From Swiss-Prot:
It comes from Shewanella sp. (strain W3-18-1). Keywords: Cell cycle, Cell division, Cell inner membrane, Cell membrane, Cell shape, Cell wall biogenesis/degradation, Magnesium, Membrane, Metal-binding, Peptidoglycan synthesis, Transferase, Transmembrane, Transmembrane helix. Signal peptide: none annotated. This is Phospho-N-acetylmuramoyl-pentapeptide-transferase. It is a multi-pass membrane protein.
Length: 360
């Protein structure tokens, strides 16, 4: 929004031309989202407490989690508000990348909100029925996938980038829609499964978003893209604004979500942030890289799949409890130890993912 105002004011003072630089707006976007989260966080927590919107804790979970019962949830509303305000202020509203991301965040945030509302306000422990949640996620993801495929302006927007291989970038054709669908829905649910400990999901989300900010910037410059053998995607630099807004909002939320948490993000936060990471990966053509950098999310998801599959096929569980972070809790690891070690793994995987841009 302010890009247009700055463009007009440049006629009178050339210093306003600085707003045309993505890097400058990205920094302002990060700071805006961060300050907004820190400023409004206490007010939201107080409001959630007054409304008695507290976390529902499963009775078969670790005993240490019983103390979390009643902790304010749906804090993802704070994250989404910070991201929306930041992106609307500093993003180029003429960019299709910006509107796609706002739709992703809004639609999946709405699905998560309905789920949270049924759990904590309606006191329905099951929340939104899994079948309906998946149907709504699928509708949103397919709408996005079809739109991106139909509006692709150059071949690079529908290629598949394969890490470690310099010139392996096959055209996907209609398979693009299938890959985009599974990436967005899968990432949304993976982050949702990871959000089980204080700060466990938000920090890896921030790390992956920061890495994608760099990748989006490189993809938007033809020289960097050609040098790194990644698709050149004109205009993808606007995704940097979205990514840094996620980083700022995430760090601001972590201030209140760190152990012991004052607020949880709820499904309204985890489903929308996960979908956002998936959508960004699709937009910059780095779906496989998301699997590497978001390895913590993948690990959590795979642990649930293995646990359920093993129990149904053999009648035995592989882990003491799934997702896998609960397994380590039941082994006696203190919650902060589990969280920090998963963060360390996430840092390693994000750096490994970035290294693949050059290791080809």
């Amino acid at each position: 929004m302010l890009v247009y105002l700055a463009e007009y004011l440049t006629r009178f003072y050339t210093g306003f031309n600085v707003f045309s630089y993505v890097t400058f707006r990205a920094i302002l976007g990060l700071l805006t989202a961060l300050i907004f989260s820190l400023w409004w966080g206490p007010k939201l927590i107080e409001r959630l407490q007054l409304l008695q919107i507290g976390q529902v804790v499963r009775n078969d979970g670790p005993e240490s989690h019983f103390s979390k019962r009643g902790t304010p949830t749906m804090g993802g509303l704070l994250i989404l508000a910070a991201i929306f305000i930041s992106v609307l202020l500093w993003g180029d509203l003429g960019s299709r990348y910006v509107w796609v991301m706002l739709f992703v965040l809004g639609s999946f945030g709405l699905i998560g909100f309905i789920d949270d509302y049924r759990k904590v306000v309606r006191k329905d422990t099951k929340g939104l029925i899994a079948r309906w949640k998946y149907i709504l996620q699928s509708l949103a993801a397919l709408l996005i996938a079809f739109f991106l495929y139909a509006t692709a302006a150059n071949p690079g927007e529908t290629q598949l980038v394969v890490p470690f291989f310099k010139d392996v970038m096959p055209q996907l054709g209609g398979v693009f829609i299938v890959l985009a669908y599974f990436t967005i829905v899968g990432s949304s649910n993976a982050v949702n499964l990871t959000d089980g400990l204080d700060g466990l999901a938000i920090m890896p989300t921030v790390m992956v978003a920061a890495a994608f900010a760099l990748i989006a910037y490189l993809s938007g410059h033809v020289q960097f893209a050609n040098y790194l053998h990644i698709p050149h995607l004109p205009g993808s630099g606007e995704l940097v604004i979205v990514c840094t807004a996620i980083v700022g909002a995430g760090l601001g939320f972590l201030w209140f979500n760190t152990y012991p948490a004052q607020v949880f993000m709820g499904d309204v936060g985890s489903l929308s942030l996960g979908a956002a990471l998936g959508a960004i990966a699709v937009l910059v053509r780095q779906e496989i890289l998301l699997v590497i950098m978001g390895g913590v999310f993948v690990m959590e998801t795979v642990s649930v799949i293995l646990q359920v599959g093993s129990y149904k096929l053999r009648g035995q569980r592989i882990f003491r409890m799934a997702p896998i972070h609960h397994h380590y809790e039941l082994k006696g690891w203190p919650e902060p130890r589990v969280i920090v070690r998963f963060w360390i793994i996430s840092i390693f995987l994000v750096l490994l993912g970035l290294a693949t841009l050059k290791l080809r």
